């Protein structure tokens, strides 16, 4: 069952992975490898709270590369927050965003130093929730934090989109426009950068075309093995 579960997960056949994972997890509840695969399948099939409940029961042994449990946990929290957003439940949205700041010890990885944690996506989503609730001071505080964050010179990160959107929300449109115009010159061949430019300019149809093209050809270049844009999938869902 473990090998079959792996097959379905590797091929992103999430409905089948959930079925096999459920049976395998019932049979081997102490096997956290199976538990993590099952939790991932639940998350990717839209069963976010079920995924979090599964993760809560696991006891993952710390080992090098054991970040997967924490990654699934964060994804499930963020996707559930997005669902609450779509349904207009902003208080619940904020609750789920707050949960992303937790690092459950049972998932096998400790919390890094604060300066190593990028929370711009979480902060932006929280700011949007505050805007919807009419709490402009709290929203502007978060927008300001995002707008003043550093953008990497080594690679283009989709979080850069959050920086210019935050600037625009703060009324600093000229500054945001200037940064986007720089991207047009510096990142002509970067599909994520081009997608961010189109989203910023509200060119939804072209942005979707770029996204589809990116998803068809997505791979990490050999010289970028140490970097993956983990937030792009979340941003492209919104």
Model-derived features: where do they sit?
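Alpha-helical segment of the N-proximal tetratricopeptide repeat
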Residues: 3-12, 190-198
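Start-of-helix register in tetratricopeptide repeats
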Residues: 2, 33, 67-71, 75, ...
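Residue-level recognition of tetratricopeptide repeat
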Residues: 6, 40, 82, 128, ...
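Alpha-helical repeat scaffolds
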Residues: 15-25, 49-62, 89-102, 136-147, ...
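Flexible helix-coil transition and linker loops at the boundaries of alpha-helical arrays
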Residues: 27, 60-71, 103-116, 148-154, ...
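Terminal, low-structured helical/coil segments at or just beyond the last alpha-helical repeat
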Residues: 177-238
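Repeat-solenoid scaffold signature
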Residues: 118-175
């Amino acid at each position: 069952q473990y090998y079959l579960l792996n097959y379905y997960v590797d091929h992103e056949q999430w409905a089948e992975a959930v079925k096999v994972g459920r049976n395998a997890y019932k049979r081997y509840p102490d096997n956290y490898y199976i538990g993590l695969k099952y939790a991932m399948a639940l998350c990717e099939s839209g069963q976010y709270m079920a995924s979090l409940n599964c993760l809560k029961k696991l006891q993952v042994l710390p080992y090098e590369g054991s970040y997967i449990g924490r990654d699934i946990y964060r994804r499930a929290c963020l996707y559930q927050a997005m669902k609450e957003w779509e349904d207009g439940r902003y208080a619940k949205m904020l609750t789920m965003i707050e949960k992303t700041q937790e690092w459950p010890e049972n998932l096998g990885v400790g919390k890094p130093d604060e300066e190593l944690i990028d929370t711009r996506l979480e902060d932006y989503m929280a700011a949007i929730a505050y805007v919807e609730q009419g709490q402009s001071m709290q929203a502007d505080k978060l927008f300001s934090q995002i707008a003043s964050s550093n953008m990497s010179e080594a690679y283009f990160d989709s979080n850069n989109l959050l920086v210019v959107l935050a600037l625009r929300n703060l009324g600093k449109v000229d500054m945001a426009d200037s940064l986007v115009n720089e991207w047009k010159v510096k990142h002509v061949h970067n599909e994520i950068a081009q997608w961010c430019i189109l989203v910023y300019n509200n060119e939804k149809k072209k942005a979707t075309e770029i996204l589809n093209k990116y998803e068809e050809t997505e791979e990490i270049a050999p010289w970028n093995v140490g970097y993956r844009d983990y937030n792009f999938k979340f941003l492209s869902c919104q």
